[in-house]
Amino acid sequence: FEEDIEAGATDSRQVEIRDLGLNRKGKEFSYLYDFGDSWQHEILVEDRLSVENKGQLPLCVACERACPPEDSGGVHGYEIHLAVREDPDHPMAEDWAGWLDPDFDPESFDAHRVNRVFDREFGGFRRSPELA
């Protein structure tokens, strides 16, 4: 994948989040997830929230919509995925029938679930009960 990395890009395996300067309001950066599907994320630090107990970090406080399923074909593939979900008579419905998860809800997002993953992945930091 080395040849796919754009000029001026930094390999995420070589940088730590704290090195990105995310403590500054207005900080922007791009993140390319999944070279095959080319999910390009533009991230903007809109605000900083104070946290009384630093042990509650990292913490997800809000988000919009569910992440697209893995290997969904990038933006174009995900658009087809959504169209097929909405219209069972869609021309691509038969091709996608075995791939679609009937329980997937593109409108859902569970910050509590994300925080449980953070707890598991980042050492089980203590959280306030209302955010756990």
Outline where the language-model segments fall:
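Short linear regulatory motifs enriched in tryptophan with gly/pro/ser
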Residues: 1-132
